[in-house]
Amino acid sequence: MKCRLIATGERAPSWVAQGFAEYQKRLSHWMPLELVEIEPGMRGKGRDAQRATDDEGRRVLAALPKNAYVVALDVPGRPLSSEQLAQRMEHWRGQGRDLAFLIGGPEGHAAEVLKSASESWSIGPLTLPHMLVRLIVAEQLYRAAAMLANHPYHRA
């Protein structure tokens, strides 16, 4: 099973990129994790934010792997504990499909993206910088994989 994290936004600051790369490396023997960065749509004074979100959505959909199980990160999505995420990951593995996790832009996901998602996941009600969400998702995927492999990383 391969995993693709498709994130809309600017290039991450070096400390986020380094942290992501660390978890990407740790995950590599359990589940290869690829980051695909989607350039954000044009926003600003006099620009239509919905148009920008729809443009991002088209590019996100184009970046989806064929037949992947798609999980959109979305505030109203289903909250999961680390243990529940590990259970979901075990279920996804059993399906034999690749995974795609989607992080939206400033206004979230386009409607078409949410419709294409197999499920949505909320990492909580906090408002977080989207760059930081990349790192949180990578860490939680590593934690879930470690739990499934009986690795001592998770000590809750």
Curated annotation (Swiss-Prot):
GO MF entries: rRNA (pseudouridine-N3-)-methyltransferase activity
Keyword presence, Transferase: yes
Location of this chain's protein in the cell: Cytoplasm
Functional description taken from the UniProt entry: Specifically methylates the pseudouridine at position 1915 (m3Psi1915) in 23S rRNA.
Reactions that this protein is recorded to catalyse: pseudouridine(1915) in 23S rRNA + S-adenosyl-L-methionine = N(3)-methylpseudouridine(1915) in 23S rRNA + S-adenosyl-L-homocysteine + H(+)
Signal peptide: none
Main localization category: cytoplasm
Keywords from the named record: Cytoplasm, Methyltransferase, rRNA processing, S-adenosyl-L-methionine, Transferase
Highest taxon above the source species: Bacteria
GO cellular component, one term: cytoplasm
Organism in which the protein naturally occurs: Xanthomonas axonopodis pv. citri (strain 306)
Binding residues annotated for S-adenosyl-L-methionine, in chain numbering: 73, 104, 123-128
Protein's name according to its UniProt entry: Ribosomal RNA large subunit methyltransferase H
Gene: rlmH
HAMAP family xref list: 23SrRNA_methyltr_H (MF_00658)
